[in-house]
């Protein structure tokens, strides 16, 4: 059975140009989630719609190298590269997690030239909620 030839101009063919770059966003929120295995940097506008994101894994690091500070710095640079093209001048930074990449990602964000209104630590802390997992015996 032969495949049908898609019509030019049909909606399913995809976009001709990227619609994401058309917006101009003056202020945004940069979320950094730093675990011990990976660092994820997400850039959103003030309403919470994601503009761009990058992680140490998508930046080319695999395995245990994803948890390194250098990988977190590379992920932050990759996420911020797209928002500088969209003229973002101000940003708020929310850092979550206790990984090694949290300071390196913040340093990369500061060097990018975006004016930071505040940096907030939003790491979830239990008020003695769930019982922690059993300690490892090696």
Curated annotation (Swiss-Prot):
Keywords: Chloroplast, Plastid, Ribonucleoprotein, Ribosomal protein, RNA-binding, rRNA-binding
Keyword Magnesium on entry: no
Gene Ontology molecular functions: rRNA binding; structural constituent of ribosome
Region (Disordered): 1-22
GO-annotated cellular components: chloroplast; ribonucleoprotein complex; ribosome
Biased composition (Basic residues): 9-22
PROSITE patterns associated with the record: RIBOSOMAL_S11
One Pfam family this sequence matches: Ribosomal_S11
Chief place where the protein resides: plastid
Subcellular location: Plastid, Chloroplast
InterPro entries attached to this UniProt entry: Ribosomal_uS11, Ribosomal_uS11_bac-type, Ribosomal_uS11_CS, Ribosomal_uS11_sf
Biological process annotations from GO: translation
Recorded family membership: Belongs to the universal ribosomal protein uS11 family.
Subunit structure: Part of the 30S ribosomal subunit.
Protein name: Small ribosomal subunit protein uS11c
Organism: Dioscorea elephantipes
Gene giving rise to this polypeptide: rps11
């Amino acid at each position: 059975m032969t495949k049908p030839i898609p019509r030019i101009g049909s909606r399913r063919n995809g976009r001709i140009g990227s619609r994401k770059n058309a917006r101009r966003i003056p202020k945004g929120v940069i979320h950094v989630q730093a675990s011990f295995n990976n660092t994820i940097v997400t850039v959103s506008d003030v309403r919470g719609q994601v503009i761009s994101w990058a992680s140490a894994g998508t930046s080319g690091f695999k395995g245990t190298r994803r948890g390194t500070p250098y990988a977190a710095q590379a992920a932050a640079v990759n996420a911020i590269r797209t928002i500088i093209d969209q003229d973002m001048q101000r940003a708020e930074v929310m850092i979550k997690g206790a990984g090694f990449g949290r300071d390196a990602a913040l340093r990369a964000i500061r060097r990018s030239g975006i004016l930071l209104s505040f940096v907030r630590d939003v790491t979830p802390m239990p008020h003695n909620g769930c019982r922690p997992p059993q300690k490892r015996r090696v």
